[in-house]
């Protein structure tokens, strides 16, 4: 009997790619989403998941739901028997979190507490949590390994992820029947090789690469480069970009880890290589054959100069490694953008 996995926020960018990998691995994903960061489309399924069904030939169960809606979550856990929960749902824009801290704490913290309480009440004690490299704050050393101090976060988004990590650690400490894998993502980019699903930001993109690809396709005039006076090779911010398909596969490896009664485990999901903003622009120009105009503007509050992973623990303990390099990330991202110039709302 295939195991049911609840995926919160599963219609979004990372969520939809993970749902596809879950289906390919033989799981039965049940997805909830409130469309805050996902395109609705005209059918009964979010457009991203409708396309996932087409790509896999398998069906996805979906319910529109907000993780702050306790009654709806209760009904969901009564209806289904879940083996595990993969928790993506939450607000995720660093800059916005500085402007709207309460929103971030309400959705990310309260939503997660409610989810954990309902999981506990129904005896579902296996969790994969979508955390972030922002929990490390300003790096004291690079590459970042899991032993690097956390909590010196530079923005409320990162703090909310840090607080949730601490809650889950405390929960696993207090009740040894809980198992949790906390995945600290670096910077996901790229798209499924088919070009059918990808990142479709609702509004102005907060992340570099969707913005770059929208400039390349002509949706936006020029890229704003936030600061060129960082202590990096070319003065622009350096990040560890990871292909979203590699990232999604990391969640399948994490589910396998839960079966070992692993307690609380934490892993970086990154490539171990940092690229600057200007290197990413050049790589995208190469993949698209387009010139990408940019202008340098002031630094963005809460940004760090450089951040990249030591991913060796995930390689050792999860048997996971990032297989897709920079060229492939940009080629796949460009294919998605070209086939879907207006994102999921593109009319065929």
Swiss-Prot record:
Catalytic activity: UDP-alpha-D-glucose = UDP-alpha-D-galactose; UDP-N-acetyl-alpha-D-glucosamine = UDP-N-acetyl-alpha-D-galactosamine
Cofactor(s) needed for function: NAD(+)
Recorded GO MF terms: identical protein binding; protein homodimerization activity; UDP-glucose 4-epimerase activity; UDP-N-acetylglucosamine 4-epimerase activity
Effect caused by changing residue 223 to P: In THC13; likely pathogenic
Active site (catalytic residues): 157 (proton acceptor)
Top-rank lineage group of the source organism: Eukaryota
Gene3D superfamilies membership: NAD(P)-binding Rossmann-like Domain, UDP-galactose 4-epimerase, domain 1
Protein EC: 5.1.3.2, 5.1.3.7
Pathway where this protein functions: Carbohydrate metabolism; galactose metabolism
GO CC terms of this entry: cytosol
Binding site for NAD(+): 12-14, 33-37, 66-67, 88, 92, 161, 185
Keywords, comma-separated and alphabetical: Carbohydrate metabolism, Disease variant, Galactose metabolism, Isomerase, NAD
PANTHER family for the chain: UDP-GLUCOSE 4-EPIMERASE
Note: Contrary to the human enzyme, the E.coli ortholog (AC P09147) does not catalyze the epimerization of UDP-N-acetylglucosamine to UDP-N-acetylgalactosamine. Compared to the E.coli enzyme, the sugar-binding pocket of the active site is 15% larger for the human enzyme, making it possible to accommodate the acetyl group.
Xref: NCBIfam families: galE, PRK10675.1
Subunit structure: Homodimer.
Disorder named in the UniProt entry: Galactosemia 3: A form of galactosemia, an inborn error of galactose metabolism typically manifesting in the neonatal period, after ingestion of galactose, with jaundice, hepatosplenomegaly, hepatocellular insufficiency, food intolerance, hypoglycemia, renal tubular dysfunction, muscle hypotonia, sepsis and cataract. GALAC3 is an autosomal recessive form caused by galactose epimerase deficiency. It can manifest as benign, peripheral form with mild symptoms and enzymatic deficiency in circulating blood cells only. Thrombocytopenia 13, syndromic: An autosomal recessive form of thrombocytopenia, a hematologic disorder defined by a decrease in the number of platelets in circulating blood, resulting in the potential for increased bleeding and decreased ability for clotting. THC13 patients have enlarged, gray platelets with defective function. Some affected individuals have leukopenia or anemia and pancytopenia. Additional variable features include mitral valve malformations, pyloric stenosis, and impaired intellectual development.
Similarity field: Belongs to the NAD(P)-dependent epimerase/dehydratase family.
This protein's name: UDP-glucose 4-epimerase
Source species of the chain: Homo sapiens (Human)
Name of the gene encoding the protein in the UniProt record: GALE
């Amino acid at each position: 009997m295939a195991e049911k996995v609840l995926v919160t926020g599963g219609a979004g960018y990372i969520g939809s790619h993970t749902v596809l990998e879950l289906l390919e691995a033989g799981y039965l994903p049940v997805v909830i989403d409130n469309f805050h960061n996902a395109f609705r489309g005209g059918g009964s399924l979010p457009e991203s998941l409708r396309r996932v069904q087409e790509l896999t030939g398998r069906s996805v169960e979906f319910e529109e739901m907000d993780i702050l809606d306790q009654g709806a979550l209760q009904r969901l856990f009564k209806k289904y028997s879940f083996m595990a929960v993969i928790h993506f749902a939450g607000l995720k824009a660093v800059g916005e979190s500085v402007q709207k801290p309460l929103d971030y704490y309400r959705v990310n913290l309260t939503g997660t507490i409610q989810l954990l309480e309902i999981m506990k009440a129904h005896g579902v004690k296996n969790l994969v949590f979508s955390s972030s490299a922002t929990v490390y704050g300003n790096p004291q050393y690079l590459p970042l390994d899991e032993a690097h101090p956390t909590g010196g976060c530079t923005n409320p988004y990162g703090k909310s992820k840090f607080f949730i990590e601490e809650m889950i650690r405390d929960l696993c400490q207090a009740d040894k029947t809980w198992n949790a894998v906390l995945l600290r993502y670096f910077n996901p980019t790229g798209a499924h090789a088919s070009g059918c699903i990808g990142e479709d930001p609702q509004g102005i993109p907060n992340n570099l690469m969707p913005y770059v690809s929208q400039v390349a396709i002509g949706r936006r005039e020029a890229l704003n480069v936030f600061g060129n006076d960082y202590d990096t090779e070319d003065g622009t911010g350096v990040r560890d970009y990871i292909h979203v398909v590699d990232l999604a596969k990391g969640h399948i490896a994490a589910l396998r880890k839960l079966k070992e009664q692993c307690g609380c485990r934490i892993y970086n999901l990154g490539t171990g290589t940092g690229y600057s903003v200007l290197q990413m622009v050049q790589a995208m120009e190469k993949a698209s054959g387009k010139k990408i105009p940019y202008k340098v503007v002031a630094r963005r509050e809460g940004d760090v100069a450089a951040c990249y992973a030591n991913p060796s623990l995930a390689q050792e303990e999860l048997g996971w490694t990032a297989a897709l390099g920079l060229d492939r990330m940009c080629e796949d991202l460009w294919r998605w953008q070209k086939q879907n110039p207006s994102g999921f709302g593109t009319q065929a």
